[in-house]
From Swiss-Prot:
GO cellular component, one term: cytosol
Keyword Amino-acid biosynthesis: yes
Residues that coordinate or bind NAD(+): G9, A10, A11, G12, R13, M14, G99, T100, T101, A123, S124, N125, F126
GO BP: any one term: diaminopimelate biosynthetic process
Name under which the protein is recorded: 4-hydroxy-tetrahydrodipicolinate reductase
Organism of derivation: Saccharophagus degradans (strain 2-40 / ATCC 43961 / DSM 17024)
Binding site for (S)-2,3,4,5-tetrahydrodipicolinate: H157, G166, T167
A single GO molecular function term of this UniProt record: oxidoreductase activity, acting on CH or CH2 groups, NAD or NADP as acceptor
Pathway terms, separated by semicolons: Amino-acid biosynthesis; L-lysine biosynthesis via DAP pathway; (S)-tetrahydrodipicolinate from L-aspartate: step 4/4
Gene behind the chain: dapB
């Protein structure tokens, strides 16, 4: 079965990568491409915009006008746009793949209320390698976590607007859950001045922004006499995009609820 996929944020860096990944897939075709309401790109061919050649899919600025043209929506946009798109998908019973990060508590609640009524895969990162890292972090934290100082480092391009990255925060959640801690209570986001000695129970986060870094993440388990580091470095957004397309084809005919990439990859 070939899955028809709609891509929101089609004019952005990730949107173009998603269109490219859909066009490369043997299991999916591009059904629709959506841009912001005020975009000047309405009517342009989505494939030509993404640099993959004419696809016969005209860009639109209203998701509700193309609901008949796709089976699954892939959404990597902004929290407010994703909340609105989830409402449309709920109304038309359309599965969603969502990689948007930076939700406020209210936005997250509104999104999840609608997303849980249709098959939805939500992940901070859709690359196979990062999701394997999540599994490795869980194992490492269970073995070493109570004897190690844990630090999460992440770096991204200068245009990224949220920090720490959604992937870094998800890593923190995995680590905290593995050692039975509440991340909200133990997370330390940056340090400055006279901080005092480090609390062993804390999980530190360090953020770097600059250049065109696609995404680097390292978790360091620092013990007396040894240090274990688990690192993932992305060199292309296509690794994320291909994972999102894989999730989209997997979602078809699944039960309505919220899944994550660990479900897609069978890592649970």
């Amino acid at each position: 079965m070939t899955t028809r996929i709609a891509v929101t944020g089609a004019a952005g860096r990730m949107g173009k990568a998603l269109i490219e990944a859909v066009c490369q897939s043997e299991d999916a075709v591009l059904g629709a491409a959506i841009v912001a309401p005020d975009s000047s790109l309405v009517g342009a061919d989505a494939g030509e915009l993404a640099g993959v050649g004419k696809q016969g899919v005209a860009i639109v600025n209203d998701l509700s006008t193309v609901v008949a043209d796709f089976d699954v929506l892939i959404d990597f946009t902004s929290p407010s746009a994703t909340v609105a798109n989830a409402s449309v998908c709920k109304a038309h019973n359309k599965p969603m793949v969502v990689g948007t990060t930076g939700f406020s508590p209210a936005e997250k609640a509104a999104f999840e209320a609608d997303a849980s009524t249709v098959p939805t895969c939500v992940a901070s990162n859709f690359s196979t390698g990062v999701n394997l890292c999540f599994k490795l972090l869980d194992i490492a934290a269970r073995v070493m976590g109570n004897d190690a100082d844990i630090e999460v480092y992440e770096a991204h391009h200068r245009h990224k607007v949220d920090a720490p990255s959604g992937t870094a925060l998800r890593m923190g959640e995995v680590l905290a859950n593995a050692v039975n801690r509440d991340l909200n209570e133990v997370a330390v986001y940056g340090r400055e001045g006279q901080t005092g000695a480090r609390d062993r129970n804390t999980i530190g986060f360090a953020t770097v922004r600059g250049g065109d870094v696609v995404g680097d993440h390292t978790v360091s388990f620092m013990c007396e006499g040894e240090r274990v580091e688990i690192t993932h470095k992305a060199s292309s957004r296509l690794s994320f995009a291909r994972g999102a397309v894989r999730a989209a084809t997997w979602l078809v005919e699944k039960e309505p609820k919220i899944y994550d990439m660990q479900d897609v990859l069978g890592l649970k």
